[in-house]
């Protein structure tokens, strides 16, 4: 089986944390024998879906990993951002028939908790690679 090609969409808001997530995700992809072949950085988590859609439209990746960090503020804004981004990301996965995995930490956490959850990126990369392989195996069985 050829190398799994991943796209990665990374939110720049809370960049100190999403930078660590991006690096961990890329390292884990390499460890799994996959390749992060495309990266788009967007201003914030709410902006992730449009970049995911562009990446899926190009068709050069097998899956997309969404990386973001939503930290709790004074209002419920963090919950709205995380819920809407997650929902649209799932919709895009179904629309294009390719895995789009969620490496977005939050909502309802502070900066310390966010730093402790940078491994969400590794989990999202692993889920993307496994899902690509399993869907290809399933397609091959049905032939």
UniProtKB/Swiss-Prot annotation:
GO molecular function, a single term: 6,7-dimethyl-8-ribityllumazine synthase activity
EC class: transferase
EC number of the protein: 2.5.1.78
Cellular component annotations (GO), alphabetically ordered: riboflavin synthase complex
Record bears the keyword Transferase: yes
Residues given in the record as 5-amino-6-(D-ribitylamino)uracil binding sites: 13, 45-47, 69-71, 102
Active site per UniProt: 77 (proton donor)
Annotated (2S)-2-hydroxy-3-oxobutyl phosphate binding sites: 74-75, 117
InterPro entries: LS (IPR034964), LS/RS (IPR002180), LS/RS_sf (IPR036467)
Keywords of the record: Riboflavin biosynthesis, Transferase
Record pathway: Cofactor biosynthesis; riboflavin biosynthesis; riboflavin from 2-hydroxy-3-oxobutyl phosphate and 5-amino-6-(D-ribitylamino)uracil: step 1/2
Alphabetical GO biological process terms: riboflavin biosynthetic process
Catalytic activity: (2S)-2-hydroxy-3-oxobutyl phosphate + 5-amino-6-(D-ribitylamino)uracil = 6,7-dimethyl-8-(1-D-ribityl)lumazine + phosphate + 2 H2O + H(+)
Entry superkingdom: Archaea
Gene3D superfamilies according to UniProt: Lumazine/riboflavin synthase
SUPFAM superfamilies, alphabetized: Lumazine synthase
Family that this chain belongs to: Belongs to the DMRL synthase family.
NCBIfam families from the UniProt entry: lumazine-synth
Function: Catalyzes the formation of 6,7-dimethyl-8-ribityllumazine by condensation of 5-amino-6-(D-ribitylamino)uracil with 3,4-dihydroxy-2-butanone 4-phosphate. This is the penultimate step in the biosynthesis of riboflavin.
Name of the protein in its database record: 6,7-dimethyl-8-ribityllumazine synthase
Protein encoded by which gene: ribH
């Amino acid at each position: 089986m050829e190398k799994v090609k991943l796209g990665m969409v990374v939110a720049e808001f809370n960049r100190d944390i999403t930078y660590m997530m991006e690096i961990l995700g890329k390292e884990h992809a390499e460890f799994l024998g996959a390749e992060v072949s495309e990266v788009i950085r967007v201003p914030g988590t709410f902006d992730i879906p449009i970049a995911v859609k562009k990446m899926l439209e190009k068709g050069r990746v097998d899956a997309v990993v969404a990386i973001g960090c939503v930290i709790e503020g004074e209002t419920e804004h963090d919950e709205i951002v995380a819920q809407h981004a997650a929902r649209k990301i799932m919709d895009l996965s179904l629309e294009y028939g390719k895995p789009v995995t969620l490496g977005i930490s939050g909502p309802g956490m502070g900066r310390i908790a966010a730093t402790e959850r940078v491994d969400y990126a590794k989990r999202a990369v692993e889920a993307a690679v496994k899902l690509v392989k399993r869907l290809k195996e399933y397609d091959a069985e049905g032939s």
